[in-house]
């Protein structure tokens, strides 16, 4: 989650990133300032930053997989710590749609939607960690990045 913000800041500074796999990235998703600010059902202004369109466009050239585990609400629960993740998942989906609209290749996976239940914020410590690694490996293979 903490690595997400570092990734979003690094992409505009280099052309050496071949792909991004982000497990429950936290704050700082970059949105283009030539579009309206993203709005979710969850109040969280830390989840995104507005950037110039030419900065945002760099993300369209990098295949990206974003994965979120279980226990993330789809509507506000009144618990700010839990709701924060609902907003982040919604922001990731909005971000993916905007990047893809500009020619990008972003996939957002919410594991329960694929039938995986019980995954925490630390998928490589979960009992199905081999399945999680396989999910990531298969995506890398589909993108020709498994060499």
Segments from the language model and where they lie:
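Alpha/beta-hydrolase fold nucleophile elbow
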Residues: 1
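The feature captures the conserved acid-bearing segment of alpha/beta-hydrolase catalytic domains
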Residues: 27-107
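A conserved short beta-strand
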Residues: 15-32
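Residues at the C-termini of beta-strands that transition into short coil/loop
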Residues: 24, 68, 112
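Catalytic active-site module of serine/aspartate enzymes centered on a nucleophile-bearing elbow/loop
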Residues: 118, 122-147
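Short glycine-rich catalytic loops that host catalytic nucleophiles or stabilize transition states
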Residues: 109-118
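Short glycine-enriched nucleophile-adjacent loop
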Residues: 4-15
